[in-house]
Amino acid sequence: MSDFSVRQSIEAMEEYSVESVAADIIVNANESNYPLPTEIAQKVAAVTAHFPFNRYPPIKAENLSEVIAKELDVDIDCVKIGNGSSELLEKACYVFGGPGKKIAVPWPSFSMYGEYAALADSEEVRYPLTPEGFVDADTVISFCAQHKPSLLIVCNPNNPTGNYNSLAEMEKIIANVDCPVIMDEAYMEFADGKELAPNDMRPMNKLWLVAGSTLSLLGKYSNLMVFRTFSKAYGLAGLRCGYAVGSIALVRQLGKALLPYHVNAFTLMVAKTLYENKELFKERIKTIRAERDKMAAYFAKLGFHVWPTATNFVTFRAEGELMQQLAEAYEQKYHDKLPAQAASGKMLFKYLLENSILVRDFTSHPVLQGCLRISVGLPEENKQILAKVTELCTEAKL
């Protein structure tokens, strides 16, 4: 790059990319494998026939912000819409980060947090999770007191481990740090937590949305922002839509980093239609939870270590005798020598891919070495996945 002037932090980065791999069963990106409910698809189709594609969208996505604010009983100025919650996370790092600033993020967790911090010329500082992937409030509070970050990000439930951390533990953090706190709740709809903040009197028909979530703490803490997405539980990953809810003071600052018309009109229309009919997803979410728990229990029975999960995915790796058997099978088949933990995960990843099943490979991760992460698919897909994992484990033991 000697002929051009490029920011040093940008030049030092690698462009994010994921290899495109064809497979019959795709369970590597925590997407929903379900189509839109028929009723919602029909509503969208009816509007699309006469949709004003020639017009700009609402300049601040007010049409979607309004229905979310009404549902959560907050002022519309407490809500911001983004192209996925990822855009909002990136912009938050611009707003609250910058040269000389630190952004505290969990580790291991969503890898893009560090990318957003770097783009904002901020220093990423990583606070550790427990060995089982949980957030320890006292650890985070001490970490923030020592490092003095200008922004703290907590991923709950955590990706890629899947852990759900209690509302009490999260509130303890929010109440005891001196910086804005982002609660990234991309997977909260899948959590089984039924606890609520003390004296929460919201109507019962809304509790499924806020149960176990820091959304129930809105209004109590001025340093809190909660980020949610339509990509996971609601299956809109292809349209990119998410939202942030928090105090007016914080959300107003976040809005300054968002460009006019930054979310397209079609996405806003579909997301609004979906949000107004989100009750249609309740049974689907229950099914995904049940399938997730069944898969986790099955992997554990086969001899894998499974991380406690409250999401739409399961993260696991082989240990002990099973790890050695899979590692030996990998070396024999591919004539490649890797540490046993990494080799066992790589063997399973390749075996599934050879059977047209694509999962997420974490075998080279410095903390999650040997791990695979499998999104919960349709029930019939999950059966095929379990059958192929069983098949390989049986062959490896022979």
Where are these regions (language model features)?
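PLP-dependent aminotransferase class I/II
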Residues: 37, 223-307
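Active-site pre-lysine segment of PLP-dependent enzymes
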Residues: 135-147, 160-181, 185-231
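N-terminal "arm"/small-domain region of PLP-dependent enzymes with the aminotransferase-like
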Residues: 1-55, 148
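PLP-dependent aminotransferase-like
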Residues: 95-154
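Conserved PLP-binding catalytic core of the aspartate aminotransferase-like
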Residues: 288-289, 293, 299-355, 378
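Conserved PLP-binding active-site segment of the aspartate aminotransferase-like
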Residues: 28, 246, 315-323, 339-340, ...
